[in-house]
UniProtKB/Swiss-Prot annotation:
Keyword Oxidoreductase in annotation: no
Topology in membrane: Multi-pass membrane protein
Coiled coil: none
Organism: Borrelia garinii subsp. bavariensis (strain ATCC BAA-2496 / DSM 23469 / PBi)
GO CC aspect terms: plasma membrane
Record's protein name: Undecaprenyl-diphosphatase
Length: 266
């Protein structure tokens, strides 16, 4: 059973790691392992909901722009200036569908989410960040939005594996396709909104059950802490992204994995 201290710690972990390319799900499982907490995966999704609210607030103007563009499109009153937004809406839709399919498949193998597997994924994430930082990988789909969406969706779906950073692998995918970092960051987090809400709908019964099984106050406290810390974290990541210092996160992930392997004999 989760207590107040556990809730605060997990909330801080989620708030910090959601917007950093170091895998929030991997860190949550890592902390839960050492706190001897056995919590349903839907609890993690609930914490993700809190940080999604941060994204909605941070991107509120952009989301409003996209919404108004969609309304104009529905009323057949679009203009040339709406074309870019319509492409982004379509891209996010494709990414969401593909990510949902991949994520649903991966969720069937939750028993594989053990510590050694997570540490290996941390190393993979660290390598991807280095490849992103030094523009090591490029691919060209000639502007084909369907192929672009499928590729990013497939890669983002792999973020369902704990230890694989969803934001990291999505930004890596977008940049490798030619998007600039700011656009890649936008795609990564705007596409997270429908994915998290979709996960809640997909697991709606489990979502209801966590309030029956776990302490109502503690789980909401954890979500509140994740929200507050997330507001700070998202601004910090933007600065790191713009300063091209993401390789620090690779160093951290490599050090974390090696430390656990050496000192805890994993």
């Amino acid at each position: 059973m989760i207590n107040i201290l556990n809730a605060i710690i997990l909330g801080i972990v989620q708030g910090i790691t959601e917007f950093l390319p170091i895998s929030s799900s991997g860190h949550l499982l890592l902390f839960r392992h050492f706190m001897h907490l056995k919590l349903p995966i839907i609890f993690d999704i609930y914490l993700h909901l809190a940080t999604v609210l941060v994204i909605i607030i941070y991107y509120r103007q952009r989301i409003l722009e996209l919404f108004l563009t969609f309304i104009r499109f529905s009323l057949r009153k679009t203009n040339k200036s709406d074309l870019t937004n319509l492409k982004l809406i379509l891209l996010i839709l494709i990414i969401t569908i593909v990510t949902g399919v991949v994520g649903t498949f991966i969720s069937k193998y939750e028993r594989m989410f053990i510590l050694p597997f997570i540490l290996i994924n941390f190393i993979i994430t660290g390598i991807l960040i280095l490849m992103l930082e030094f523009n090591f990988f490029k691919i060209d789909f000639k502007g084909n939005i369907l192929l672009v969406g499928i590729f990013i969706g497939l890669m983002q779906g792999l973020g369902a594996f704990p230890g694989i950073s969803r934001s990291g692998i999505t930004i890596f995918s977008a940049v490798s396709l030619g998007f600039n970092r700011k656009s890649a960051f936008e795609i990564s987090f705007l596409s997270l909104i429908p994915i998290v809400f979709g996960a809640i709908l997909f697991k709606y019964k489990e979502f209801y059950d966590i309030f029956m099984v776990l302490n109502f106050f503690e789980i909401n406290l954890g979500a509140l802490v994740a929200f507050v810390v997330g507001i700070i974290s998202i601004n910090f990541f933007f600065k790191m992204l713009n300063n091209k210092k993401l390789y620090y996160f690779s160093i951290y992930l490599f050090a974390l994995s090696i430390t656990f392997c050496c000192f805890f004999r994993i």
